[in-house]
């Protein structure tokens, strides 16, 4: 009959690196006001995170107003482009042109919905252009890192189905698949790192949780008998067959 073998190994939940988003500023300046920027906090896309004051921003706005007032079309367009490159949106630019009120600070908003997993600044921080200030993680899908022993390596493949269980919810099973196998063994444990992608739509799985990963692979058609029919003496193994005559 067809048989399936199951590989069981411990797994640790980590963030999906393709779902990490860095919040940076594109201009030099100083962080003035913090909104929702606490490590571990959930933010929605578009939520304000913090404001930054930059003399460059003030100068660029003044140049736009001057060019627009003078009717210099090309200079006005260039000034608008500069502001949009600094993440000032078109609505804010139109409001500036209508009110002629220069904004001294720029509000940076969350690019995606997710959890703040790292914050590298406080109010008053001197921020440099390109500096990573916050890191957000979308946890709607997570990675489970597991160690595979050498005896099972021949059967583990990228793309194979995987299942994750947690001691906290023994009745729950989280389906996933293997998406990565390391190119080298760990020199200490002599195991290979395998990564599983596990959908997490209900957000029940949290980073740094530990669980048990199950990987199943087909052994093909094999001769199989019930385990109860096997007797091991230490030196030999015997299999008993029911003759069907009801005798002792």
Predicted regions, residues:
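Periplasmic scaffold and linker elements that assemble and bridge Gram-negative envelope complexes
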Residues: 1-181, 185-193, 197-199, 203-206, ...
């Amino acid at each position: 009959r067809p048989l399936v073998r199951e590989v069981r190994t411990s797994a640790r939940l980590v963030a999906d690196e393709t779902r990490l988003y860095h919040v940076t500023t594109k201009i030099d300046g100083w962080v003035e006001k913090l909104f929702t920027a606490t490590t571990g906090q959930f933010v929605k896309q578009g939520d304000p995170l913090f404001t930054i004051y930059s003399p460059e921003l003030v100068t660029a706005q003044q140049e736009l107003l001057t060019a627009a007032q003078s009717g210099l079309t090309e200079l006005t367009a260039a000034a608008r482009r500069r502001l949009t490159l600094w993440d000032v949106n078109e609505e804010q630019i139109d409001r500036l042109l209508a009110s002629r009120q220069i904004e001294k600070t720029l509000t940076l908003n969350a690019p995606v919905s997710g959890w703040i997993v790292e914050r590298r600044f406080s109010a008053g921080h001197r921020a440099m252009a390109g500096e990573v200030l916050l890191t957000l993680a979308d946890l709607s899908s997570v990675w489970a890192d597991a160690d595979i022993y050498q005896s099972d390596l021949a059967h583990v493949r990228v793309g194979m189905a995987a299942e994750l269980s947690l001691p906290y919810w023994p009745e729950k099973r989280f389906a996933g698949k293997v998406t990565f196998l390391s190119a080298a063994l760990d020199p200490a444990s002599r195991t290979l790192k395998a990564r599983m992608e596990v959908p997490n739509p209900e957000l029940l799985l949290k980073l740094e949780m530990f669980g048990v990963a199950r990987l199943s692979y087909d052994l093909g058609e094999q001769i199989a008998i019930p385990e109860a029919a096997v007797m091991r003496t230490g030196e030999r193994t015997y299999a008993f067959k029911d003759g069907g005559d009801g005798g002792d």
